[in-house]
UniProtKB/Swiss-Prot annotation:
GO BP annotations, alphabetical order: proteolysis; signal transduction
Domain of life: Bacteria
GO CC annotations on file: outer membrane-bounded periplasmic space
Family note: Belongs to the chlamydial CPn_1016/CT_858/TC_0248 family.
A Gene Ontology molecular function term of the record: serine-type peptidase activity
Matches recorded under CDD domains: Peptidase_S41_IRBP
Protein name: Protein CT_858
Pfam families: PDZ_4, Peptidase_S41
InterPro entries (alphabetical): ClpP/crotonase-like_dom_sf, CPAF_PDZ, PDZ_sf, Tail-specific_protease
NCBIfam families found in the cross-reference section: chlamy_CPAF
Length: 601
């Protein structure tokens, strides 16, 4: 391994000799400098680095050399080409948190959503145009003469493992490309081969909804760039730096969402593609589970339905959709109205009084705020819930944050003093002395790790010091819970089922989550390659028995994918019938599921 690294370094040096700086275009020079900065970021602050080396066989030096060669061997590269190389460089980490976004507006999409069934077929489940020869329930066979599976293979990132989450990401990209995410954007028409439900096949020509790039390419304007001229009498008008507070880019302040989420949200908004299949959709794509007895109005899709068990007995079951943990991104969120955790609390109080069990739909959830996640979990339990710990990459940035917490809470010794310092709640999680003590403990643990040099991948630390989620003082749902998950649950949406599963609080049903298992930090830096932001993972979450969430995801108790009939007819009847059967078992067997020898129920 050491000889391989030496060889790669020699190769890099040799490449530099044979590619003199003066022979490189301005665009290439800028991209190489930005690549070097990204490499430095990964070396210093990317927590899963060692894990990626073991799990993927990924190597930072080798990946960097490969990207350099791509940039140097392309004659007069365009900015978009360089952006694609940098996106692929970070994409090789196979990390849903890690990625670069760009200042670019070129995009293209086809107004269709496709979903894969349990038998490996691809069906159209949503048509977002008034005029189309394609219908819901049609099967997608080929794209431009190539089988769908082969086309998806070209959309995977390097070092992919072929997981369901990776395939879903490729499937999402199949009909939606954005230069802001480093995609190569198509235009014109493409040919889709489809099969109707009754068996006939046909080819349909469809046109990409294309938006051209409006940001001029640096490669085009480079010849016109002149060195700036300053008059001797010119005075400086640069504003003074405000040092009144510490503006942190540390791992403690960024939402836990995939790197593409902001760009995808913007794409949904600007293209008008409103669909229940969208990530973060308020309603989701599942139909109601039965006759509706009660229904909420507001930010959450929530209702009570009557469900009949195998003995003909009727049960009242609650259904609640949690679309996102980025509460400010909720589709109907009104900043002037009550916060979502207050509405959530009212819904849970109704469920506590009027249901025998609760189904939570958390499919297609992008993640979000960890404190908001804790707030919701605190209302779904009547006992403390143990939390995963985090192995962190620590820098002086995190040390200053730890000192800030300790200074803020230095003389806090009561519930009242805790609320004076922190407010009544932290994104819905009730503040008391225990919260203040957790935060102080967190600060002390960070400082202790720093003083011992335990900074590269620290001893596991509870995030924000929260060893446990404690029940909400007034709202505590204590009846059986069934949580529906899938491969498009990211980050906080990985942690929600982890906490409930590892504490035996809920039955987890569906398919394995995406596996974005750590905290996120974002970096912005001046550049001319059009990089808007770089998002990386700053910690590795560790479950109770030492298992990572990163890349692995959360395995459900009951694996339940969607069948072809579920998807083709858009009723998901087979899926929901099994879910209702499981919930009735939970109700009738005191929260226990009885499986047959073959795993059926």
């Amino acid at each position: 391994m050491k000889m391989n690294r030496i060889w790669l370094l020699l190769l890099t040096f040799s490449s530099a000799i044979h590619s003199p700086v003066q022979g490189e275009s301005l665009v290439c020079k800028n991209a190489l400098q930005d690549l070097s900065f990204l490499e430095h970021l990964l070396q210093v602050k990317y927590a899963p680095k060692t894990w990626k080396e073991q799990y993927l066989g990924w190597d930072l030096v080798q990946s960097s050399v490969s990207a350099q060669q791509k940039l140097r061997t392309q004659e007069n590269p365009s900015t978009s080409f360089c952006q694609q190389v940098l996106a692929d460089f970070i994409g090789g980490l196979n990390d849903f948190h890690a990625g670069v976004t760009f200042f670019a507006i070129e995009s293209a999409y086809l107004p269709y959503t496709v979903q894969k069934s349990s038998d490996g077929r691809f069906y159209f489940v949503d048509i977002m145009t008034f005029s189309s020869e394609i219908r819901v329930g049609d099967e997608l066979l080929e794209v431009d003469g190539a089988p769908v599976q082969d086309v998806l293979a070209t959309l995977y990132g390097s070092n992919h493992k072929g997981t369901a989450a990776e395939e879903s990401a490729a499937l999402r990209t199949l009909f939606s490309r954005m230069a802001s995410l480093g995609h190569k954007v198509p235009s014109g028409r493409t040919t889709l081969k489809i099969r109707r439900p009754f068996g006939t096949t046909r080819e349909v020509r469809v046109k990409w909804r294309y938006v051209p790039e409006g940001v001029g390419d640096l490669a085009t304007i480079a010849p016109s760039i002149r060195a700036p001229q300053l008059q001797k009498s010119m005075r400086s008008f640069f504003p003074k730096k405000d040092d009144a507070f510490h503006r942190s880019s540390s791992l403690f302040y960024s939402p836990m969402v995939p790197h593409f989420w902001a760009e995808l949200r913007n794409h949904y908004a600007t293209s008008g593609l409103k669909s229940g299949y969208n990530i973060g959709s308020t309603d989701g794509f599942l139909p109601v589970i039965g006759p509706v007895i009660w229904e909420s109005e507001g930010l959450f899709r929530a209702y009570i339905s009557s469900v009949t068990d195998g003995d003909g007995k009727s049960h009242k079951v609650g259904f609640l959709r949690i679309p996102t943990y980025s509460w400010q991104d909720m589709e109907d969120f009104d900043p002037s109205g009550p916060p979502p955790w207050e509405e959530f609390a009212k819904i849970i109080q109704v469920f506590s009084s009027n249901t025998e069990a609760l189904i939570i739909d958390q499919t297609n959830n992008p993640g979000g705020s960890v404190l908001y996640l804790y707030a919701l979990l605190s209302m779904l339990t009547d006992r403390p819930l143990e939390l995963p710990k985090h192995r962190m990459i620590l820098t002086q940035d995190e040390v200053v944050d730890a000192l800030d917490w300790l200074t803020l809470l230095e003389n806090v010794d009561t519930n009242v003093e805790s609320r004076l310092a922190l407010g009544d709640n932290m994104e819905g999680y009730t503040v008391d002395l225990q919260v203040a003590e957790y935060l102080k403990s967190f600060g002390r643990q960070v400082l202790n790790c720093w003083s011992k040099g335990d900074i590269e991948l620290s001893t596991p630390i509870p995030l924000f010091g929260f060893e446990k989620i404690h029940p909400h003082p007034r709202v505590q749902y204590s009846k059986p819970i069934c949580v529906l998950i899938n491969e498009q649950d990211f980050s906080c949406a990985d942690f929600f089922p982890v906490v409930l599963k590892d504490n035996d609080r809920a039955l987890i049903v569906g398919t394995r989550t995406a596996g974005a298992g750590g905290f996120v930090f974002n970096v912005q830096f001046p550049n001319r390659t059009g990089i808007k932001t770089c998002s990386l993972t700053g910690s590795l979450a560790v479950r109770e028995h030492g298992a990572f969430i990163e890349n692995i995801g959360v395995e459900p108790h009951i694996d339940l994918p969607f069948t072809a009939n579920d998807i083709r007819y858009k009723g998901y009847s087979e899926y929901l019938d099994k879910v209702k059967k499981l919930v009735c078992q939970l109700i009738n067997n005191d929260g226990t599921i009885i499986l047959a020898e073959d795993g059926s129920f």
